[in-house]
Amino acid sequence: MENAHTKTVEEVLGHFGVNESTGLSLEQVKKLKERWGSNELPAEEGKTLLELVIEQFEDLLVRILLLAACISFVLAWFEEGEETITAFVEPFVILLILVANAIVGVWQERNAENAIEALKEYEPEMGKVYRQDRKSVQRIKAKDIVPGDIVEIAVGDKVPADIRLTSIKSTTLRVDQSILTGESVSVIKHTDPVPDPRAVNQDKKNMLFSGTNIAAGKAMGVVVATGVNTEIGKIRDEMVATEQERTPLQQKLDEFGEQLSKVISLICIAVWIINIGHFNDPVHGGSWIRGAIYYFKIAVALAVAAIPEGLPAVITTCLALGTRRMAKKNAIVRSLPSVETLGCTSVICSDKTGTLTTNQMSVCRMFILDRVEGDSCSLNEFTITGSTYAPIGEVHKDDKPVKCHQYDGLVELATICALCNDSALDYNEAKGVYEKVGEATETALTCLVEKMNVFDTELKGLSKIERANACNSVIKQLMKKEFTLEFSRDRKSMSVYCTPNKPSRTSMSKMFVKGAPEGVIDRCTHIRVGSTKVPMTPGVKQKVMSVIREWGSGSDTLRCLALATHDNPLRREEMNLEDSANFIKYETNLTFVGCVGMLDPPRIEVASSVKLCRQAGIRVIMITGDNKGTAVAICRRIGIFGQDEDVTSKAFTGREFDELSPSAQRDACLNARCFARVEPSHKSKIVEFLQSFDEITAMTGDGVNDAPALKKSEIGIAMGSGTAVAKTASEMVLADDNFSTIVAAVEEGRAIYNNMKQFIRYLISSNVGEVVCIFLTAALGFPEALIPVQLLWVNLVTDGLPATALGFNPPDLDIMNKPPRNPKEPLISGWLFFRYLAIGCYVGAATVGAAAWWFIAADGGPRVSFYQLSHFLQCKDDNPDFEGVDCAIFESPYPMTMALSVLVTIEMCNALNSLSENQSLLRMPPWENIWLVGSICLSMSLHFLILYVEPLPLIFQITPLNLTQWLMVLKISLPVILMDETLKFVARNYLEPAILE
């Protein structure tokens, strides 16, 4: 039923044709069940294991590698002679890499549990309904409830469907609907129509929502929505419809993969075409087909050379190490790619309650009357320190600590706070914190009594458990609570009837009252000044109310409670406690004692974190279910707004936002820093608008209501104390629920991206070198300098270790003074592309040069001419151009070993170059990252291993080198450091200043 909250009880019952006392007939139930289905959320069909595996092979680079492996396998099958076994090594290794990558990918996807499944934990098992087949209430499975059912709910129940209240069977009905609306305190419900068809869920005070909990009271209602039509069902549908966006890094790597695959294809075709003239060379036995296959193998080698096989593994390792560092800072990352996304966060949309604030209501101000003369009066105003439930804090007057027992008014105020109260403090030994037992507002008063210590109780030597309620216990020993007049909407107050534990002539029974100031003060005839009682004049009342109004607005927006007593109440037997309508009569002729102002205080460290965000170019937006006044006040306190800043067009309620045109809504999201009284749909809409500006949005949330927005935003951040749904829909969980942890995680994300950029560039320059090497050998007609199995070894192992170690580079000192990077910024810009192309060309030329040196100039080499080397395929005993040359020399393992050793050594030098993008090695020496030094040593050790330990040289088709050859390797390799230092010098002195200008 649409807009059931706007209809009267009679209209709703009439719509379903149901009587409140008898319920639906079984015939009606059957029809309604057929129409609306079961009252449960359908499970989402997940992807099958096969679908997940196939998905892992949708990446272009992976497909090229797969193709290369298949071709290598087919070619190896037709290989003859000694090389048959080694020919199978290459396709086997490629397949091994692909399988390992696929396993990691599938595991990660399976690990991101389904948030939609977690929603099911909010579905109650059973419900209590009235139906015509039985005279009394019956318990049935919640999934069998249908729209139109008459349901009974009582304290402790989980609401089984969306229900329009028809009657309340207790003085009040309080509902904890925080999981759905984010409201920090339980909500009092009523049965009157709410005439606004566009009311947000918080304002539908006559509705109960599926999955919420009854905190107090008992009521009846008619079911108006079940299953996916409930508010929680709508959240489920929204989550199903939300497609997970790929992270900026994933998009970059996708683009890079596409570009690389095109370049690889072109180069492979070019190499093959260049050598068409050599297809008939004698070495191929004059067979054109065998020649074509030989050059096809070289093209496959090129593909293997061009793809950085180690990149996925290195990225995963770097992100995993980043998550460990973040976990130490209380940020638990659930999705690895999001670690890097944090680095380009440009907007943080934060919940107020519990994230920016402590979610621990705390009294920060109070006043009692000091002096009254006619219509004029003066107040004693006090401030209270401490912003958590810990009973630690001081009471200050004029910024100086005071002893509360010196003020009679404060003694009475503390007595009311302690007795007119059903809450307590509890010390949680496991967590080492004080927690509330009961309502947040009442716990704030309990905590205030402990801080005031009006009877000067000796607190030293008490354990933390004993300390929790020590001062309250003293007051409760003096007077006994006989009964409570529960809170009701009409009088906006509650009271307790107390009698002294030691009756005497002077001590009489009293009623202590607390409630909304306007309601309580209207019923006060007197006012307490010290220990005396003075009539309340209109002037005094006006003065008191003006102070309360000032506290309730202004910079604090405190929640104020008036405290009063009834010194001569009726006796218990004279009161009718069955009818709550009479309670207001018993709470008249009151004496006003004082007022307390409380708020959910901002976390101490949040203001500095907001300032840090501003320096880092990150906009912080507060999004809350609370009212606008409170939200703006907290924004001012933590620095989201300046103290006197005009918040017009910067702060909106959900209603104000809805009333704007779509273009005005878009503009609002461009400037706004505060949204109050919002619903889940608003959060998702705000995220959509921000994404349309290419903002990278981090969204926090803890309730079921936050899940769609958490899933939609680039970075969903759930609270450690939040619901399972929020956690499973998010990328990150804050173990300490603290906003400052987000800022620390953003800083870590920026550092990780910078390091990632370094090692991606490092790996790519290595691949450019390998491609140039193979292209040069093919273009010059030289024998192969590097074969695929060697390239795989270099790409995976030798380069992989230093690349991983580059992930440990220390972050730049000014990392949080720069604006967020543009997610569209390419991994490799124009200048850097030139730089890595230049380095890559040197690597390729040096590798080919090392092989050529052994053929042409080495002492132990054949010393052939350049012509002979470049036409080696024409080498035959009867060819006069090759007189005196043993043709078998062109298959010697030495040139390959020289080429591989130069490639590995240059790559180690390159790793040192990658310590910093533009800083010289003199400014940033290798020991700045000791992991890098260790990984270079390990990589070189592994290279020696394949050179000198049998049977590895046979597999890699290489052979041990002597000292002269090693010296030549170093001479060819070391200039790469000088070359990169020159390029860095140009960047530092000529390019960076130009960019900054």
Swiss-Prot record:
Catalysed transformations (reactions): Ca(2+)(in) + ATP + H2O = Ca(2+)(out) + ADP + phosphate + H(+)
EC number per UniProt: 7.2.2.10
Reported cofactor(s): Mg(2+)
GO molecular function: ATP binding; ATP hydrolysis activity; metal ion binding; P-type calcium transporter activity involved in regulation of cardiac muscle cell membrane potential
Main subcellular location of this protein, as a coarse class: endoplasmic reticulum
Lumenal topological domain: 70-89, 274-295, 777-786, 851-896, 949-963
Region (Interaction with TMEM64 and PDIA3): 788-997
Activity control mechanisms: Has different conformational states with differential Ca2+ affinity. The E1 conformational state (active form) shows high Ca(2+) affinity, while the E2 state exhibits low Ca(2+) affinity. Binding of ATP allosterically increases its affinity for subsequent binding of Ca2+. Reversibly inhibited by phospholamban (PLN) at low calcium concentrations. PLN inhibits ATP2A2 Ca(2+) affinity by disrupting its allosteric activation by ATP. Inhibited by sarcolipin (SLN) and myoregulin (MRLN). The inhibition is blocked by VMP1.
Tissue: Isoform 1 is expressed in the heart.
Bilayer topology annotation: Multi-pass membrane protein
Enzyme class: translocase
Topology Cytoplasmic: residue spans: 1-48, 111-253, 314-756, 808-827, 917-929, 985-997
Region (Interaction with HAX1): 575-594
Pfam families tied to this protein: Cation_ATPase, Cation_ATPase_C, Cation_ATPase_N, E1-E2_ATPase, Hydrolase
Gene3D superfamilies per the UniProt record, alphabetical: Calcium-transporting ATPase, cytoplasmic domain N (3.40.1110.10), Calcium-transporting ATPase, cytoplasmic transduction domain A (2.70.150.10), Calcium-transporting ATPase, transmembrane domain (1.20.1110.10), HAD superfamily/HAD-like (3.40.50.1000)
GO biological process, one term: intracellular calcium ion homeostasis
In-chain residues carrying the UniProt-annotated modification 3'-nitrotyrosine: 294-295
Subcellular location: Endoplasmic reticulum membrane; Sarcoplasmic reticulum membrane
Residues annotated to bind ATP: 353, 442, 489, 514, 559, 624-626, 677, 683, 705
Residues annotated for Ca(2+) 1 binding in this entry: 304-305, 307, 309, 795, 799
Post-translational modification: Nitrated under oxidative stress. Nitration on the two tyrosine residues inhibits catalytic activity. Serotonylated on Gln residues by TGM2 in response to hypoxia, leading to its inactivation.
Protein's job: This magnesium-dependent enzyme catalyzes the hydrolysis of ATP coupled with the translocation of calcium from the cytosol to the sarcoplasmic reticulum lumen. Involved in autophagy in response to starvation. Upon interaction with VMP1 and activation, controls ER-isolation membrane contacts for autophagosome formation. Also modulates ER contacts with lipid droplets, mitochondria and endosomes. In coordination with FLVCR2 mediates heme-stimulated switching from mitochondrial ATP synthesis to thermogenesis.
Swiss-Prot/TrEMBL domain comment: Ca(2+) and ATP binding cause major rearrangements of the cytoplasmic and transmembrane domains. According to the E1-E2 model, Ca(2+) binding to the cytosolic domain of the pump in the high-affinity E1 conformation is followed by the ATP-dependent phosphorylation of the active site Asp, giving rise to E1P. A conformational change of the phosphoenzyme gives rise to the low-affinity E2P state that exposes the Ca(2+) ions to the lumenal side and promotes Ca(2+) release. Dephosphorylation of the active site Asp mediates the subsequent return to the E1 conformation. PLN and SLN both have a single transmembrane helix; both occupy a similar binding site that is situated between the ATP2A2 transmembrane helices.
Subunit structure and binding partners: Interacts with sarcolipin (SLN); the interaction inhibits ATP2A2 Ca(2+) affinity. Interacts with phospholamban (PLN); the interaction inhibits ATP2A2 Ca(2+) affinity. Interacts with myoregulin (MRLN). Interacts with ARLN and ERLN; the interactions inhibit ATP2A2 Ca(2+) affinity. Interacts with STRIT1/DWORF; the interaction results in activation of ATP2A2. Interacts with the monomeric forms of SLN, PLN, ARLN, ERLN and STRI1/DWORF. Interacts with HAX1. Interacts with S100A8 and S100A9. Interacts with SLC35G1 and STIM1. Interacts with TMEM203. Interacts with TMEM64 and PDIA3.
Protein name, as recorded: Sarcoplasmic/endoplasmic reticulum calcium ATPase 2
Species per Swiss-Prot/TrEMBL record: Canis lupus familiaris (Dog)
